[in-house]
Amino acid sequence: TESEIGVDWPWGNHTNGLTWRWIISPNIVAKTFLASSRYRYDFDFYFDNKETYIDNDSTIHNDFAFDIVYKDIIKDRTLETEIIWKANDRHTITGGFQRKDINFDLSNEYIITTLDTTFTSKPLDMKNRTRELAAYVQDKWDVSDKIKFQGGLRLAHYNLHDKVYVEPRIGMKYNISSDMSFKMNWGRYHQFLITANDPDENFRLIDLWMGLPEDKPASVSDHAILGFEYFSPKNILYRVETYYKDFNHLLSLKQGDVYAENEGEVQSTPFNEFWDTDAYAYGLELLVKKTSGKFKGWVGYTLAKTFYYTPPNGWFSPNHDRVHTLNVVTTVELPNWVSDNLEMNAAITGSSGNPYTPIIGRANEWEQEIRGGRANYPGAPSEMNWFSSNKYLVDKKNSDRYPSYFRLDIGITRKNRRLFKWRYDSYIQIINVTNHENALSYLHRTRTDQSTGNRGVVERAPLNMFPFMI
């Protein structure tokens, strides 16, 4: 017997770019950017088992192999040209053009091979080529020493849609004083790239990207931002921003029945069926940042709310929604009497738990199947069979949240060390110092009586993120 099992997993991207900057005159500068990139995700899990039996004068060979292949290859060719014209002391006009040619090759394949038979199933095989064209113009206008205005217009075209998308943008900044300002921005944006990932996945190794299908409208969003900034004499930045974002025609992947627990069945989600999804988000962001001196760092707090709407679920909070998030990052240069060039750092992250759909019970489902009779076997009697399966009962989508998230990391860095003529920094980092258990997901099982085989209540255990690590 010979067995072979393995994974072939080339994954990564590379980009080649060329930039040409041309000073046409003291007031006009042109910049052209040409880029070619390839993103590649090619996962192949394979198993091959060869057996040989020798019995007296006969030899029997048996061969069984299977392959599971996921492939996502994206090739992008981009050309951008931008011209900046300093018209006068108060107006700076920018205009440009962009062209993106993208080839998508997305597939999923199952291959089963025996000694004399090969079975191939390809539930996903999508190849398409898209082209995005855009032209834009923008004017930065210094209305006065205190008021600055920026207005622009972008026109976008997607080759699979027979229309031109109009994207206006406006912004204004009012300098209350030399170190204090108020700003506002509004803009409309379209997107022609989508992901074919299960929206309920909390962890994924890769995003499967694809171009917007011809029969789907482009995703559109309107962003509005209001902000206030103050830069203190002690080189500390204080910033407050509030925002509102409205989304239409987001595409959410339709899910298979992920809560079924039928033995011997594979629950799958199609890669090319989507719900037309609406959404909106609003929030408040606070930032205090110090970038100079022996003690540096920043403190950021975010209050955010996000809601999605799909036909089967109504309005709900998506998996990535976190209402409260606090981040504290500090760096301290220790005095020379402790040690030369020694720096300590710490990072604290705390947030509300992410939403999830809770399982509230379990039920049995029965299905009826009729075999035989005149339609299938003329003259044979009909047979009626019943099949039972188990299914979890769930509450409303994302109606509960995981426990709050907390993590403290600390580290020490020794800078400007020397090895022969080379300089380097050495560091040690401790992750999750308090070993706080942060749930990534929950694992469920049905309690079973081993003596009778009867199935009882549903049990739950957390699948945690990073533990204490050095």
Role assignments for model-derived ranges:
Residues 10-161, 236-239, 298:
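Face-selective signature of the C-terminal outer-membrane beta-barrel domain
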Residues 74-76, 86-92, 98, 124-247, ...:
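Structural signature of Gram-negative outer-membrane beta-barrels, strongest in the C-terminal barrel
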Residues 2, 40, 108-111, 159, ...:
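Surface-exposed extracellular loop regions of Gram-negative outer-membrane beta-barrel proteins
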Residues 76-82, 123-128, 134, 217, ...:
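Outer membrane beta-barrel strand-and-loop segments of large Gram-negative receptors
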Residues 347-381, 385-388, 402-407, 414-470:
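C-terminal beta-signal and adjacent terminal beta-strands/loops
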Residues 25-29, 86-90, 143-146, 179, ...:
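Short loop/turn motifs that connect adjacent beta-strands in outer-membrane beta-barrel proteins
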Residues 144, 244-246, 264-355:
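Gram-negative outer-membrane beta-barrel transporters
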Residues 32-38, 95-101, 151-155, 184-188, ...:
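Transmembrane beta-barrel strands of outer-membrane/channel proteins
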